[in-house]
Amino acid sequence: MTSLTHKAQEVFRHDRFATEVTGIRVDEVREDYARCLLTLEAKHCNAMGAIMGGAMFTLADLAFAIASNSRCLIDDRPLEWVSLGSSIQYLGQTKDDTLVAETSCVKQGSSTCVYNIHIHDSKGKAVALVTTTGIHLSN
């Protein structure tokens, strides 16, 4: 585990809804990149027995928060980026017991950023795609 991953785990453990209630784990962090994991349980399912959209969105939201603030973690600065808006496309369901969210940075500017968060199962099957725009808190 890298020191950046460890630092992100320490900082974002305070995102208690994502980490304690939902059970999301921070797996890997690099500059502008985060990978988070969610082991699926019955509590993550909707009335139809499918994965609840909110569980997938929470997974993507935490991955975005970590990736967009990764440079702050590297430089030991306070967190500076928050979500301004997101869209989610549900691409399919999975029978797998693990969801993985991985970020890709589209733009990391001085006042706004855009990230795609790809959610797939542990076998690589695409489950959702989230696009999130963030804003720097100084703006």
Regions found by a protein language model. Give the residues of each.
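Terminal targeting signals and extreme-terminal segments of soluble enzymes
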Residues: M1-N139
